[in-house]
From Swiss-Prot:
This protein's name: Hypoxanthine/guanine phosphoribosyltransferase
Organism: Methanocaldococcus fervens (strain DSM 4213 / JCM 15782 / AG86)
InterPro entries cross-referenced by the UniProt entry: HGPRTase-like, PRibTrfase_dom, PRTase-like, Pur/Pyrimidine_PRTase
Assembly notes: Homodimer.
Molecular function as annotated in GO: guanine phosphoribosyltransferase activity; hypoxanthine phosphoribosyltransferase activity
Length: 183
């Protein structure tokens, strides 16, 4: 499959002691092949529960191409949690802590009772998903499914234990000896 092939050959950048994989789905560089995006979204649709879903939710930035494509395939509208405040009525701020940053995320466009699916590009520490789940609970949304494309580290387990929600992923990876390994 193209996702796994491109992960195995993607560049690795070391920052401090952490090895980052640089991939079109997680970083938008070097170039996003539409075949790869189509494959990923088709796989998300196959494993996801999109029945009676009102909205698809992601956090900026790399979830945006995923939910845009997914919305076109499913005709379900999407909502993007932004890193900046818009001060719209009902806006919900939540704190986000990831492996590389801390800050606020802001949720708009969710009504009480909305049935939602959460989509994210990568789960590693779980910080982004925990923030999204917290905001959606505050808004009164019903979370029907949570799908991340790439799983790395213990984030999936952390989110499942902390929130009680099951996380689906397309591929689990690690970086070993400067290369991505599919687990």
């Amino acid at each position: 499959m193209l996702l796994e092939e491109t992960l195995k050959s993607c560049p690795i950048v070391k920052r401090g002691e952490y090895h980052y994989f640089i991939h079109p789905i997680s970083d938008g560089v070097p170039v996003v092949d539409p075949k790869l995006l189509r494959e990923v979204v088709t796989r998300i649709i196959k494993i996801g529960n999109f029945e009676d879903v009102d909205k698809i939710v992601t956090a900026e930035a790399m979830g945006i191409p995923l939910v845009t494509t997914l919305s076109l395939y499913t005709d379900i509208p999407y909502v993007i949690m932004r890193k900046r405040e818009y001060k719209l009525p009902g806006e919900i701020p939540v704190f986000q802590s990831t492996g590389y940053s801390k800050g606020q995320l802001y949720l708009n466009g969710i009504e009480k009772g909305d049935k939602v699916v959460i989509i994210d590009d990568v789960i590693s520490t779980g910080g982004t998903l925990i923030a999204i789940i917290e905001a959606l609970k505050k808004a009164g949304a019903e979370i029907k499914d949570i799908i991340c494309v790439i799983e790395r580290g213990e984030g999936k387990k952390i989110v499942e234990e902390k929130t009680g929600y099951k996380i689906k992923t397309l591929v689990k990876i690690d970086v070993v000896d400067g290369k991505v390994v599919i687990l």
